[in-house]
Amino acid sequence: MRNPLVAGIARAIASVGLYALRFNFRGVGLSAGEWTGGLAEVDDLDLAIADARALAGGLPLALSGFSFGAVTTLRWLAQGGRADAVALAGVPLRSATFQPEQLPPVPDGTFIVAAELDQFGTAAELRAAYPRARIVALTGVDHFFGEKRNEVGVLIAEQIAQDLRLD
């Protein structure tokens, strides 16, 4: 997993005293399998969560995802998955070809860090689409958050800690 934003989120989560697991979906990097555009990747997430739960015993589960990982997290939740906290970044309303994404519902209260200038769905568009989500907008950045990548990790880690009552 070489995405600097995802790596920063994992570091920030670990910095508040939580375990952080990040992984490549099938067909990405050195992972086996073939990418399916989000269909079978929900199974990858389910297996990663099962492994994390096995390692962590009864500790609470918090999920975070960026872009494709955020959509996959939402799909997993829509299929009945449960987490104690959910904090996402860069939730795309449009695909890489700028076609509308068919997103599953965003559970009420989901925390989302959005980019004001996100080419796949601005903060304003996300607020209109998901009025019951807790959305924090970072100004002056696009989908990849540029120089505000570290801020994304801090916001997510702090929110997860608060949601899990760790602060």
Q: For the regions a protein language model found, what residue spans apply to each?
A:
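Conserved alpha/beta-hydrolase "acid-adjacent" motif
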Residues: 119-125
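Gly/Ala-rich beta-loop-alpha elbow adjacent to hydrolase catalytic centers
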Residues: 64-73
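Catalytic active-site module of serine/aspartate enzymes centered on a nucleophile-bearing elbow/loop
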Residues: 147-167
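Alpha/beta-hydrolase active-site loop
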Residues: 5, 34-55
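Catalytic histidine-centered segment of alpha/beta-hydrolase-like enzymes
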Residues: 32-33, 141-153
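Short, surface-exposed "cap/lid" segments of acyl-processing enzymes
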Residues: 1-24
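Short beta-strand/loop motif that positions the catalytic acidic residue
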Residues: 105-107, 111-114, 118
